């Protein structure tokens, strides 16, 4: 249930499920765009849904990726511009986890003016648990919001490898 952080990896379990589903429903064409933070199109790719997606990824890496030459003892991260609520602010945490040494600390800053999660109120309850407890909830059928559960499981996994501090 807990896999390594898939951020920036085109071959991750979620992507595999999407590609499998796309093949089942016979998607014939995908128009994939790489955009700026102001939603301006930089480049567009069209064609087979997997190939157009992968081409877009390769271009997006040149625009949005930052090379990391080593892992930090402490990483300070901002969620900007995804900071309306903590649900969105996690993008900063996931990026920081990739840049931080095992056991190293993460300090995330995010304003979250709308709180933790407007659309997934149960998520705040899930966030208090470790991965073992969350997995027990799943096997016992106690999970109502599977999207919130999955994200809480990812956060728990990061917290088990890094002390995390949030300033909001």
What name fits each language-model region?
Residues 90-168:
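C-terminal non-catalytic interaction/assembly regions of soluble proteins
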Residues 41-47, 87-88, 118-122:
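Short acidic, glycine/serine/threonine-rich loops at helix termini
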Residues 34-36, 79-81, 110-114:
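Histidine- and/or cysteine-centered catalytic micro-motif in compact active-site loops
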Residues 73-78, 107:
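Structural motif
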Residues 1-71:
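Conserved, well-structured core segments that form the ligand-binding/active-site neighborhood
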Residues 13, 87-92:
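Short, glycine/acidic-rich beta->alpha junctions
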Residues 79-89:
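Short, glycine-rich nucleotide/cofactor-binding loops
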